[in-house]
Regions:
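Short, small-residue-biased leader/transition segments that mark boundaries at the very start
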Residues: 2-3
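Extracytoplasmic
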Residues: 10-12, 50, 63, 73-77, ...
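Flexible glycine-/small-residue-rich
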Residues: 15-19, 82-86, 112, 123, ...
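Periplasmic/extracytosolic POTRA-like scaffold domains at the N-termini of outer-membrane
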Residues: 19-61, 112-138, 176, 186, ...
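Membrane-embedded segments
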Residues: 53-88, 103-106
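Short beta-strands and strand-coil junctions in structured, solvent-facing domains, enriched
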Residues: 66-67, 77, 86-90, 108-109, ...
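Extracytoplasmic segments of membrane-associated envelope/inner-membrane machinery
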Residues: 81-158
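Extracytoplasmic/luminal low-complexity segments enriched in Pro/Gly and acidic/polar residues
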Residues: 175-221
């Protein structure tokens, strides 16, 4: 037996919640509450009777937890590490649906406490389109420092064409279909650096990236 005494009791539980910079949904108190409610809170229990698998199983049922890992130490401590699901997009569809999408394209409840600002998605957002295609675009924005800071809103038109509302500059960006979005945004970034920095960020009302190898700008009236 790895424990000092056969009848050693658990004297401490260490809880680690990962990804708190992006997701502030789950508190340590909440995790304790789940385990207490199920009667498997480890402190005070005999170490040999504590099932780390049961702890992992119960915590993983939580809708905001991606995975849970539990292990015991020889000194009588139980360690619990929880990975949260990361919200990428906040969907507020014109059909009344309201939810977060996580980094794996799974729907999260709208009442989740999100600590970081998330890109808002509006317009004709079908859930199937959001879970299959839109979330990948959201992950790209989230993982790219420049675009994460620059894009404030994604608007989905009835034909699933996409408009982007940037934080800086008073213009709309028309992306068209999501296909080749990386190439389209690379062109836009280049245009921002070379074009808009020279003529000013408010010269154009609309920037169209729909067609390959060109950018069509509409001047402000």
């Amino acid at each position: 037996d790895v424990y000092k005494r056969q009848d050693q009791t658990c004297r401490d539980m260490e809880l680690v919640i990962k990804d708190t910079a992006y997701a502030g949904f789950i508190t340590k108190e909440e995790l304790k509450g789940i385990l207490q409610h199920k009667g498997i809170y480890p402190i005070g229990k005999k170490m040999e009777r504590i099932s780390t698998k049961s702890l992992e199983r119960e915590l993983s049922k939580h809708p905001l937890i991606d995975e849970a890992e539990c292990y015991k130490t020889p000194s009588g401590k139980v360690c619990v590490e929880v990975t949260q699901r990361i919200p990428i997009l906040r969907v507020m569809s014109s059909n009344g649906q309201n939810y977060y999408l996580d980094n794996k394209g799974t729907v999260m409840p709208p009442d989740a406490k999100c600590v970081a600002h998330r890109v808002i998605v509006t317009g004709n957002v079908e859930k199937s389109f959001a879970m299959k295609d839109l979330y990948k675009f959201g992950v790209f924005l989230h993982n790219n420092k420049f675009w994460d800071a620059q894009i404030e809103q994604i608007h989905v038109l009835p034909d699933q064409n996409i408009e982007l509302v940037p934080r800086v500059g008073d213009h709309l960006v028309y992306l068209g279909k999501l296909e080749n979005f990386e190439d389209k945004l690379a062109r836009l970034k280049e245009f921002y650096k070379k074009g808009l920095n020279r003529v000013g960020w408010n010269k154009y009302s609309r920037i169209n990236l729909e067609f390959n190898n060109q950018i069509i700008c509409t001047k402000r009236e």
